Amino acid sequence: MTYIENIFLCMVSPLLVAALCMGRRQLRFFLFCIAGMGVCLLSAYINTFLAAVCQADALAATAEIAPVVEEMMKLLPLVFYLLVFEPEGDKIKPAAITIALSFATFENVCYLIQNGADRFSFIFFRGFGTGAMHVLCGLIVGGGLAYTWQRTWLKIAGTCGLLGAAITLHAIYNLLIAYGGAAQYIAYALPVLLVAAGKLSAFRLSRRK
């Protein structure tokens, strides 16, 4: 049995100490890291509860419940940040990526503790694939919110649309992972390739300007 709340405390403790030492300018980064790990912890409990209530099998829990719960939970601290602090557009995407990255980090650590770390090649691909998938979802949501929240009429519809896009991408990834075999490694490679293609496109556009 994996006591993920104990893992959470161990990972968050040094972040809290670092946040106190680094000063106010860096405080936002550490708070978003802690928020990302916190919503990952809560997502695990909610996923388990909903799977039990709905009597879902492993495939249904992985492909139908987990993507919806996890993407909604990752959105909550971001929406709180937007509503309370009303940040400028250029601060929204880094916040979303930080939450997504810390979510993926905590998820990977829990996976390693539960399943072992003896298969290096599998762990290597899973680490990059899962991390890139969560970061890609963070890029979609964060980049989109930076645009939609500057326009009042787009806030609600835009947020729902971006959440739906992130859930769909997450569900496709989880479905390929659950299928196994070659599809599993395609799933690991796909987010990495999409992130790389996006960065390359952004670099080319910046050079043209």
Segments predicted by a language model, with ranges:
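Hydrophobic alpha-helical segments at protein termini of multi-pass membrane proteins
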Residues: M1-K209
